[in-house]
Amino acid sequence: MARSIWKGPFVDGYLIKKVQKLMKSGKSEMIKTWSRRSTILPIFVGFTFSVHNGNKFIPVYINEEMVGRKLGEFAPTRTFHGHGADKKVKRK
């Protein structure tokens, strides 16, 4: 179910503070975060976030198409190694 519009998007407060601090300084550092649940805001465009996937940090560069989605959508938590091979001998 989608979030109510009257509530607005959820973003951890420290992420907004970090982005504003980087905007003032003019630096282009990676912002390290565990907050996969935070919504991407328009002020995040152009920044690179290191999003934790449970094992390591995945670099995610934010562009305009990502606005409104969650940070966790771009850092997959599971790796697919393929299905097991068929061990039965096929007869002709």
UniProtKB/Swiss-Prot annotation:
GO terms for cellular component: cytoplasm; small ribosomal subunit. One of its GO terms (biological process) is ribosomal small subunit assembly. GO terms for molecular function: rRNA binding; structural constituent of ribosome. PROSITE patterns: RIBOSOMAL_S19. Coiled coil: none annotated. NCBIfam families: rpsS_bact. This is Small ribosomal subunit protein uS19. It comes from Rickettsia prowazekii (strain Madrid E).
